[in-house]
């Protein structure tokens, strides 16, 4: 006859874990954005969290903006985060582009007044198809404006302008002089240091 195996006691790892509240940075009004379990607070550091702008502001029209945060320190049962970037949803970007229009992408790394580097990706959509020379000039104007604006703003001020859409509005008003634009959005940002 076969021998019965000795039963091993299974340890429930969930009982060892504690729940930590995740909060946004001070420039995003120190709001609570979720909870996460961890056995040790050190395991939380570096963990990424993604939240829509609607969840933070309550404004449903900002549903398409996703903000990315990373936990950088833990104090008690509160995990504090830092902003690492944002992006817009692909379905929103696709809805802006139609046949007979031009999609102009401009990407640049800008440096803020307090020596922080941020990569910004701007999307401009024209009302009709633009010539390649017009598109090239528009990219140049957009990149110059981004660099100029970032140089005179602190990191927190720049992020607020990017997320609220005020920088995109400023780009729109300057770039529409070259060719009529339908829409301008900063579709992605990434903090480099």
UniProtKB/Swiss-Prot annotation:
> Matching Pfam families, A to Z?
Ribosomal_S3Ae
Q: Which GO terms describe its molecular function?
A: structural constituent of ribosome
Where would you find the membrane-spanning parts of this chain? none
Kindly state one GO CC term assigned in the UniProt record. Answer: ribosome
Q: Which GO terms describe its biological process?
A: translation
The protein's matches in InterPro entries, at most eight in alphabetical order, are given as: Ribosomal_eS1 (IPR001593), Ribosomal_eS1_arc (IPR030838)
Q: Which UniProt keywords apply?
A: Ribonucleoprotein, Ribosomal protein
The family line of this record is: Belongs to the eukaryotic ribosomal protein eS1 family.
Protein's name in the database? Small ribosomal subunit protein eS1
Source organism per UniProt: Methanobrevibacter smithii (strain ATCC 35061 / DSM 861 / OCM 144 / PS)
